[in-house]
Design a protein with these regions (language model features):
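P-loop NTPase catalytic phosphate-binding loop
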Residues: 1-115, 127-130, 137-197, 206-215, ...
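Short, highly charged C-terminal tails/helix-capping segments
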Residues: 116-124
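Conserved beta-strand-loop-alpha-helix hinge in the C-terminal portion
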Residues: 202-203
Length: 257
């Protein structure tokens, strides 16, 4: 890859209590990341920080994105970018089609790997696909999805994504125990948890009561292999910042032409 010495895309989430950078790498086994917490505490801001870093660093490596914007107001600035497989999706039917597409893409990639003489190199050469589903609980409120549909999707996705360099970020503010538990947290080894209303909810989401003490633009981060979560804070990142970063990196925003 040209953009980084890492084989797989990485981003800076923010700073820890010691002032050092907290980074996340979209490695083969980091298939699904869960962002959860109360409304207005920075989930969309962090998604924008992640997306803009990935676009700036890995655009030339062929990284691609699918953005499901279930509310329809958070990610319009990305419309027309060449690295989007489709413009941000807002309709439940479109999002379901995208979920089916990425499962099929996993199958296609796996078939290609099996045909390769150097399977390790074939895997490393696959450009990453990042599928963001923001406020995914809205899909269920609009009557197109049931929680079992998302559970089935995640189960089938995780099965192959460890070989195919495809990744999902799920973001939600919905906090009902039945809703979260139905999705099976074992599929979500990466957790980025924002402010929670009570310690029980915090414990369930990230095995720590400390998310109740978080403020805006703060989170607890935990990934596969970590024994406990780490604190992370980040700066606000506005829609204007997104547009300026896209322009400064000479990326053509077809939506403005």
């Amino acid at each position: 890859m040209n953009a980084s010495q890492n084989k797989y895309p990485s981003v800076v989430l923010g700073l820890g209590k010691d002032g050092k950078e907290i980074t996340h790498t979209f490695g083969l086994r980091e298939a699904v990341a869960l962002m959860a917490g109360t409304c207005g505490n920075g989930r969309s801001v962090l998604i924008n920080r992640i997306l803009t870093q990935l676009i700036a660093k890995y655009f030339s490596d062929g990284i691609q994105f699918i953005i499901a914007d279930t509310i329809g107001i958070s990610f319009n600035s990305y419309k027309g970018l060449p690295c989007l497989i489709k413009d941000p999706l807002t309709k439940p039917e479109e999002i379901r089609e995208a979920m089916d597409w990425i499962l099929a893409e996993n199958e296609r990639r796996l078939a290609s790997i099996k045909e390769s003489d150097d399977k390790k190199k074939a895997i490393e050469n696959l450009p990453a696909i990042i599928f963001v589903i923001d406020e995914y609980s809205y899909l269920f409120k609009r009557g197109i999805f049931e929680t079992k549909d998302m559970g089935s999707f995640l189960r089938n996705f995780v099965k192959l994504s460890r070989y195919t360099n495809t990744h999902v970020i799920l973001s939600t503010q919905r906090r009902e125990k039945e809703f979260i538990d139905t999705l099976n947290l074992s599929y979500m080894e990466t957790r980025m948890i924002f402010h929670c209303l009570d310690e029980r909810e915090s414990e369930r989401l990230i095995s720590s009561p400390d998310a109740v003490n978080l403020k805006q633009d703060e989170l607890l981060y935990m990934n596969r292999g970590m024994n406990e979560p780490v604190f992370c804070s980040f700066e606000n990142f506005t829609d204007k910042d997104v547009k300026e970063l896209i322009k400064s990196n000479n990326l053509v925003n077809l939506g403005e032409e």
